[in-house]
C-alpha cells in the first residue's frame, strides 16, 4: 500500500488532479472565528520563511505611524500578538492565516507589518521576516533603547531631535497631548522627568523584573523613554496608555476627562512607585532615595509636647489669606510674600494645626536629595473651591535649608543643604476653568522652558520667579567632590 506522501507526490505531478486536492485532516478555522485563532499556535505551524529582500518597503508611510496609543487590535480589542500595519498605521491581531492582519494584507494590499512587542517586521501574506537597516528608525520610534553611559550624560550633553516634518525639538522638553482635561497629568509627568534619580532609573529599568507586573510602571517607563527619544517622528508624545493605566489602578479617581489636583496625583503616584519598586533585601526604593526626608514633629499632649520622627516626600507651605477689603488703590495690587516667610513653619517655634486637628510644631530632621514643596493655594468648602492668588517669591538658586534642620539631628551641619530649582508647576486662571503648566530647567543649556500641553516656549528665569507657583522641585547641589546622586550605580539598580 502506497504511503500518503507517495500518493500526494503522484497527485501533484498529475495535471489531471489539479482540481482534486487531497482531503484535509484538520478543519481550518472559519472567518467568524478569526478572533479565536491563536497567533502563537499558527506561527508554530506556519513558521516565518527565511529572510528575503522585501519589495514593499517603499509602501511604508512613517507619517501615519503612531505607537502612543493602547496596543490592541482595532477589530477585536485583543492585546495578544498585535501587529501594526506600516502602511496605514492600524493595529491588527495575529500573523498566520485567517487572522485579521493576514486578511488586511489581502484586502488592502498592505504587506508590511511590525510586531508591537519585539519590533520584528514581517511581510504578509507571504509571512517572511524582513531585515533591513532602513527599518531601524521605526523600531527605535516604537521602543527607544538607552545605554547606561547615555543616560548618565543626559543632563550634561546637548542633544536635539528632528521630526519628520522638519521641526526641531529638545528631547526631555517636548509637549504632551491633552486628552481632555489632562493638563494636571501632563505637568506631573514632566515633574518626574526633571528628577534625574528617578528618571534615569526608569530609563534603564527592565520592566520584566517587576513581579507581579504593574501596568502603571510599565507604561510610565515607556512614556519617559519616548519623551527622551531623539528618533521621535513627531516631536510630541501622547500619554494615552499611561493615563489609561492610572485610571484603572486608581479605580477612576484620576482619569481622562475629569480634572483633578496634581498634588494629589503626585502623592498617589509616588506612593505607588515607592511600594512597587522596593528592594527585596533593603526594603528601600528609588523614590525614597530621591524624595525621602524626615520631620521631627512635636505634638501637644496636654501641657507637654511629644516628638516623633516622621518620613515625608513633600512639604506643604501655607499661604496667608489675601486681604478681603481693599481700597481703590489696592484693587489692582496682587499680594506678595517671600518663601522664607512661609518656611518659618519648620523652625519649630510656632504651632500649626495638623490635618487631624492636633497642634504641632515642625523641624526638619533629614533633607532629601529632591525637595518637593507644595504651596497651598486652594481651599475647599461645602460650596466651591477658592484660590489664593498671592505671589510667592522664591530663589532660583541657593535655597538654604540648613537653618531649618533640628539641632538634635545627626544630619545638622554634615550635609550640603543648598538647593537649586529644577521645575515649578503653576496654575493660571480661576479654580474651576484654570489650567496647569510647568517651567522646567534644561540642564545641558541652563535655559528655562514653559511647557503647557503641546506648547513649548523658552522663558526667562525672571518670568518663572513671578508665576503663581503651586508645586516646586528643588535639587540638592552637588557635593564638593562633584559626585551626583543620580549617577550612583546603587541608585540605578535597586533589585540586586
Protein language model features and the residues they cover:
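UBL (ubiquitin/ubiquitin-like) substrate-recognition surfaces
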Residues: 2-496
